[in-house]
Amino acid sequence: VFIEFCVEDSKDVNVNFEKSKLTFSCLGGSDNFKHLNEIDLFNNIDPNESKHKRTDRSILCCLRKGESGQAWPRLTKERAKLNWLSVDFNNWKDWEDDSDEDMSNFDRFSEMMNNMGGDDDVDLPEVDGADDDSPDSDDEKMPDLE
């Protein structure tokens, strides 16, 4: 289970994994606003196998389920809709596809996050018409409005 706390410029990050609870706290932003979240999880996790990683824009947590292959219908024990919690469907994975590769993906995921900036050594392919001398359809005169 992946959880991302979107806090820019976080300091004093503390993530505590317990068997059925996750506690997160930090100071964030230029005003050092104190963030605190305590989540009673739907089911148990393995605190020793769960990890977190701080980036400039967020804190990424990877929770290892206590029993692999067991579906969680939601993240929290309570059924109430929490306004601060949303699903990232770009990273959605059906529980039926759950496998042991999940934690190894966390290492690759954090590596990907570290490499999201530009890389000056990357050779980009040539794009036809991308040079400054080529005529552009935006340069054509617009018809008068009637």
From Swiss-Prot:
InterPro entries reported for this sequence: CS_dom, HSP20-like_chaperone, p23-like
UniProt key word Lipid metabolism: yes
Pfam families: CS
Gene3D superfamilies with a match to the protein in the record: 2.60.40.790
GO MF term list: Hsp90 protein binding; nuclear progesterone receptor binding; prostaglandin-E synthase activity; protein-folding chaperone binding; telomerase activity; unfolded protein binding
EC number: 5.3.99.3
Key word Electron transport present: no
CS domain location: 1-76
Biased composition (Acidic residues): 118-139
Gene Ontology CC, one term: telomerase holoenzyme complex
Subunit organization: Binds to telomerase. Binds to the progesterone receptor.
Function comment: Molecular chaperone.
Descriptive protein name: Prostaglandin E synthase 3
Origin organism lineage: Eukaryota, Metazoa, Chordata, Craniata, Vertebrata
